[in-house]
Design a protein with these regions (language model features):
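Extracytoplasmic
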Residues: 1-163
Length: 163
């Protein structure tokens, strides 16, 4: 009997989930959710992931291989929605929301953390800082432990510098 149910279930095509959702400030997902929007970074698809704030147990990581030892400026894409969310801010009785997000840079056996208030930064590339990075794997981590209502994880870039 369970075999018949399994065969019947296989006849029905499962609905394909959409890869990208719309950002809905009145409903924040509890898990990382992909969004596509004009304020996100992308060459083909402007996309990012977002979720509601949490305890820090959920994180996203960006991994890259640094080709040679040297100084690198590490930047993140600030998908800024403050102006777009003004109507929500007015309804909540505030005009600005602090968006502190802490990025952790791991390389070799080193770990450094940098906290940015992304509401104070412009939309686009924002520097986390300049770091001397050895050749090899570098990991940037962003957790869901933030001061605002939500966290957005978009793009990270590494630019070789003189110092």
């Amino acid at each position: 009997d369970s075999n018949n149910r399994h065969k019947l279930k296989d006849l029905f095509k499962k609905k394909d989930d959409e890869k990208y959702k719309n950002f809905m400030p009145w409903w924040m997902p509890s898990q990382w959710t992909a969004i596509a929007a004009d304020y996100c970074y992308g060459e083909t698809i402007n996309s990012a992931v977002y979720k509601n704030k949490g305890s820090g147990a959920n994180a996203v990581e960006w991994k890259t291989e640094i080709p040679k030892d040297g100084y690198y400026e590490v930047s993140i894409w600030n998908a800024k929605m403050s102006g777009r969310m003004f109507f929500m801010d007015r309804r909540r009785g505030r005009h600005k929301e602090e968006r502190n997000q802490t990025y952790t840079i791991q390389y070799d056996k080193e770990k450094e953390s940098v906290t940015l208030d992304l509401d104070e930064e412009t939309e686009g590339w924002v520097s986390i800082g300049n770091f001397y990075l050895p050749q090899g794997e570098v990991i940037i981590t962003l957790t869901d432990k933030v001061s605002g209502d939500y966290v957005i994880a978009d793009a990270v870039k590494f630019t070789a510098t003189e110092e």
